[in-house]
C-alpha cells in the first residue's frame, strides 16, 4: 500500500521590524497545494518572499491522533519546521518539514526547532479527512 502524500509548496517572507538588536524576522506566509516535484527548489518572489517547492505532507498511521487533534480544533493548521540557512549564496528561511500532526510539530519544537503554522487550505483538509476517518 502506498503512503498517502500531498505535494505542497511553502512561501517564507522576510519582514522588516524596528528593534535594537535585529532588523528583520522571517514568517511563514503560506502553504499551498502544488505539483509533485523530485527536488527542492526555491524562487525569489516580490516583497522579500521565497517560494519553496518539493515538499509533501505524508500521512503515517502512528500520527493519526495528532492529525485528529489538529483537524478537530477550531483553527486547523499546517505546520512547517524551518531553519535559517544559506541557499545559493543568500541567507533565507529554508523549510525542512511540513506536517499536519500536532504531536510531530510539538516534538520538533521540544527539540529546539523553529515551527510556524498557517491555516490549512481547503484542498488539503478535503484530502486528509477521508484518510483520518479510516484510521
Indicate where each model-derived feature is located:
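Terminal targeting/leader modules
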Residues: 1-122
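Mixed-charge, glycine-accented linear interaction segment located at domain edges/termini
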Residues: 115-135
Amino acid at each position: 500500500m502506498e503512503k498517502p502524500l500531498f505535494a505542497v509548496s511553502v512561501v517564507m517572507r522576510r519582514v522588516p521590524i524596528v528593534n535594537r538588536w535585529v532588523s528583520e524576522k522571517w514568517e511563514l506566509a503560506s502553504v499551498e497545494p502544488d505539483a509533485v516535484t523530485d527536488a527542492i527548489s526555491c524562487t525569489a518572489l516580490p516583497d522579500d518572499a521565497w517560494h519553496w517547492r518539493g515538499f509533501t505532507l505524508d500521512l503515517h498511521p502512528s500520527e493519526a491522533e495528532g492529525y485528529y487533534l489538529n483537524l478537530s480544533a477550531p483553527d486547523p493548521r499546517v505546520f512547517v519546521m524551518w531553519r535559517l540557512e544559506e541557499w545559493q549564496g543568500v541567507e533565507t528561511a529554508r523549510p525542512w518539514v511540513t506536517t499536519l500532526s500536532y504531536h510531530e510539530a510539538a516534538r520538533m519544537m521540544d527539540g529546539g526547532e523553529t515551527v510556524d503554522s498557517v491555516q490549512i487550505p481547503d484542498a488539503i483538509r478535503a484530502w486528509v479527512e477521508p484518510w483520518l476517518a479510516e484510521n
